[in-house]
Each structure stands twice: as C-alpha cells, then as structure tokens.
C-alpha cells in the first residue's frame, strides 16, 4: 500500500509532498503529478503553479549519511544488462533532461520529461562526478538517460581527460552517425 505516488521529475513533487505531510494549518495543499487517497478514493492532483527545477539547479546527490559499504550487491536476473545495472555500485547521474532526438515512435514524446530537452553542461557534470567520487570513494558512473546525447558525451569525455580523473562510466545510447572511433 502506498499513500502517495509521484510521477516523472521528482524534485518538486517530493518537495511539495513533504510540505503537505508537514502541514499543520488548514490551507489548500499543493501537489505536482501526484496520486493520493482522498475520501477513500485514489485521485490525481496537479494543482501547483510552480515549475519543475532546471537540471542545472537540482545539484549533486548526497550519499553522506548512507553506509554505502554495508549495502549488498544483488544481481536481479541473468539478463546481462540487469547484471551490469545491479552488480556492484554505480553513482547515478543524468546528462540531460528529456530526449535530444524526440522522434522515436515507441516513446510518448508529449510528456514533459521527454519533450523538454535540457542538457547539463559538461563542466557541471564532471564537477558532480568529482563530488560523488570524494563523497563515496566510488569512481563508477551510470548516466541514467534513456538516450544520452552524443555531443554531450564527447564534451564530458574531454572534460574528464582535461581534469585527469580516472572514472568508468556508461549510459544508454541511440546508435547514429555522430559516433566516431574517437
């Protein structure tokens, strides 16, 4: 059983949910893309005028209070991709909000979290990588984009080389001509 389910970008929906749960006054509570129980019925609320945060504003994940060395590594199933995702620990980041391509017929490109393409600057991404390495001691990164932008991947790689940091990183891609042997 769940009391609330939020959809898509999570920062603002979770912030509003926190405010709603902590609310002690009788004022209209605002939600963003949230399912909840109201009068014994599941209802969808999207009654805020606030906009989602820009990707450059969301900051770096903070794992400082987690005992990362106490977590077990679990391989979910024999699928090699699931093994890659689950075996060991990967710091998770996003290169871009939305999709740079936006033309796949299997994807619902009408959804804001897909159609509103907003890449993060390579410098900011590598800053975040360095913060996570310092915090977690782990230098493996999984960029969780559905399809990472090739031009941005190149910029990130060049920024990593420029800073002389040693990392392992991977992401999902769309195969296209912009990829070179370089």
Regions found by a protein language model. Give the residues of each.
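Radical SAM [4Fe-4S] cluster-binding motif and immediate context
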Residues: 61-182
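Glycine-rich beta-alpha loop elements in corrinoid/cobalamin-binding modules
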Residues: 1-52
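Generic secondary-structure boundary/loop-capping signal
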Residues: 32-33, 55, 96-97
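N-terminal export/ancillary region detector
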Residues: 48, 56-60, 65
């Amino acid at each position: 059983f769940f009391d609330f389910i939020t959809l898509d970008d999570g920062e603002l929906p979770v912030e509003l949910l926190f405010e709603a749960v902590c609310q002690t006054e009788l004022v209209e509570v605002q939600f963003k893309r949230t399912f909840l129980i109201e009068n014994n019925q599941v209802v969808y609320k999207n009654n805020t005028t606030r906009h989602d945060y820009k990707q450059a504003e969301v900051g770096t994940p903070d794992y400082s209070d987690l005992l990362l060395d106490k977590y077990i590594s679990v391989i979910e199933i024999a699928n090699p991709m699931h093994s890659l995702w689950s075996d060991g620990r990967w710091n998770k980041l996003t290169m871009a909000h939305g999709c740079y391509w936006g033309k796949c017929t299997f994807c619902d490109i009408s959804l804001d979290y897909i159609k509103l393409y907003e890449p993060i600057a390579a410098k900011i991404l590598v800053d975040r990588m360095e913060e996570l390495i310092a915090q977690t001691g782990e230098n493996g990164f999984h960029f969780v984009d559905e399809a990472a932008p090739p031009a941005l991947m190149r910029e990130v790689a060049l920024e990593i080389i420029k800073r002389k940091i040693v990392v392992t990183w991977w992401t999902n891609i769309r195969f296209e001509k912009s990829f070179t042997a370089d």
